[in-house]
Amino acid sequence: SRALNIGMKEVESDAALLLSAHCALYNEVAIEKLIEVQDIFSAAGVFGRQIPTKDSLDIDTRDLLTVFGRERIVYEKHPFFHNAFSLIDTSVWKKIPFSTEVNGIEDRVWAYQVCSDGYKVIYEPSAVAYHEHGLNQGCSNSRAKRVVRALKSLHKNDEVLSFD
């Protein structure tokens, strides 16, 4: 998240495209789709569909195909967001940068914060990128523990969840 904020500080345009080193665009219109949807909804962030590569592990393929569906989703209260292939409104980011207190789900924490401030986050499935390692980067138990700690904190006010 620190590196994301450093990069975002250098952006001089109205929006910043984030594309992970593990991602590759599916086609030449992927970025145009993100921009188009951001303009239509005045969204703080738009993220695209991520699909596995031929070399992705089965566990990553499963996760990508499960999470990144084929229907647009407009999030206003309880968002999901994945910054590996996304477009972020820089004016919103200047008000609400990525938290440096969280590692691994800083994008979801950011989305929750911007939605809490009245902004929208959009999932746009017509914007597509390949993602080699997917959401969880294989089966790293130490990463899973770190992410679960952060998720529990993010969901601490959920009435139906109890982590005691």
Which functions belong to the PLM regions below?
Residues N103-Y112:
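Acidic donor-binding loop at a coil-to-helix junction in glycosyltransferase catalytic cores
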Residues V46-R49, E124-P125, E132:
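Short glycine/serine/threonine-enriched helix-capping/active-site loop
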Residues D14-A24:
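Short beta-strand-to-loop acidic/aromatic patch adjacent to the donor-nucleotide binding site
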Residues P52, R70-I88, N103:
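A recurrent flexible, glycine/aromatic-enriched loop bordering the glycosyltransferase active site
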Residues E12-S13, H82-K95:
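Conserved nucleotide-sugar donor-binding
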Residues A24, E28-I59:
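Conserved donor NDP-sugar-binding/catalytic core segment of glycosyltransferases
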Residues S1-V11:
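Glycine-rich, basic loop-to-helix element that forms the pyrophosphate-binding segment
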Residues V121, Y130-D164:
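Active-site-adjacent helix/loop segment of glycosyltransferases
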